[in-house]
Amino acid sequence: NIVYTDWQRDNYYRAVRKVVPDNSRRIALEGDHVTIEQRAKFCYYLSQTQFIDIAPATMRMRMIKSAEEIALIKIGAQVADLGGAACVAAIAEDVPEYDVALAATSAMTREIAKRLPHVELRDTWTWFQSGLNTDGAHHPVTTRRLKQGDILSLNCFPMIAGYYTALERTLFLGQPSDEQLRHWEI
């Protein structure tokens, strides 16, 4: 870890410079996590160093999972299913989107805490949109109240130990109209 103050611009890069040995010839960076500006600053403060982009290799390595990782991901999928069920149970006419999302997120958080009592509880969330709010993927949850015939977008994302799984479903409140069905069948 690097400790630095931010009282002067670029102190982070100065701190990195102090801990990188002078004879360092190469440093690996994940290029897709470094902005153009950040890369330029690394090159400026570590001008004798060559930077290698290891993002493709790192991504390939991350695709290989241990038995423990697979077990966490499977638990995440089960938790997402419970979140989806809680979401569906909360859906009713005149209920605001945020209440539906809160029900699903609370159910998932409680289930994670029950199954894994010593894990950090963070970054588990639900996106839930209704009606016109479903016109694009992953709009923020709003105070819009559900109406009969609404198309609904359910997205539950439990996060366990840095691994997230996703349950995404499209639903309707009541029966879809003939026009909605026609578009759905396209």
Residue spans for each PLM region:
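Active-site neighborhoods and metal-handling regions in enzymes and metal-associated proteins
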Residues: 1-186
